[in-house]
């Protein structure tokens, strides 16, 4: 346990930020899974809607620095490839 006042504040802030980051990343992962489930069910309309939502969540995670932009591009590319494979 830190004794210095600023260290106590930093510990509190870090815990709050970690909780926030976990929430954002979890929402991103859930959105990605929704796309994959829609693709598995061969539901093209649902998959396209889920892809749009997932891309939005992924981009927000990049904006806050939770995911590297190249990793995000990879996620979105793979999901788009799966969704486009349904309509072909």
Curated annotation (Swiss-Prot):
Family: Belongs to the bacterial ribosomal protein bS20 family.
InterPro entries linked: Ribosomal_bS20, Ribosomal_bS20_sf
One Pfam family cited in the UniProt record for this chain: Ribosomal_S20p
Species name: Bacillus pumilus (strain SAFR-032)
NCBIfam families (alphabetical): S20
The keyword tRNA-binding is annotated on this UniProt entry: no
Keywords for the protein's UniProt record, in alphabetical order: Ribonucleoprotein, Ribosomal protein, RNA-binding, rRNA-binding
GO biological process, one term: translation
One cellular-component annotation, GO: cytosol
Name used for this protein in its record: Small ribosomal subunit protein bS20
Keyword Aminoacyl-tRNA synthetase: no
The encoding gene: rpsT
HAMAP family: Ribosomal_bS20
Function: Binds directly to 16S ribosomal RNA.
Signal peptide start-end: none
Gene3D superfamilies reported for this sequence: Ribosomal protein S20 (1.20.58.110)
Gene Ontology MF, one: structural constituent of ribosome
């Amino acid at each position: 346990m830190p004794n210095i006042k600023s260290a106590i504040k930093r510990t509190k802030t870090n815990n709050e930020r970690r909780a926030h980051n976990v929430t954002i990343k979890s929402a991103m992962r859930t959105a990605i899974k929704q796309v994959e489930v829609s693709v598995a069910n061969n539901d093209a309309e649902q998959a396209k809607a889920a892809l749009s939502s997932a891309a939005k969540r992924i981009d927000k995670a990049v904006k806050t620095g939770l995911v590297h932009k190249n990793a995000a591009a990879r996620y979105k590319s793979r999901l788009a490839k799966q969704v486009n494979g349904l309509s072909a």
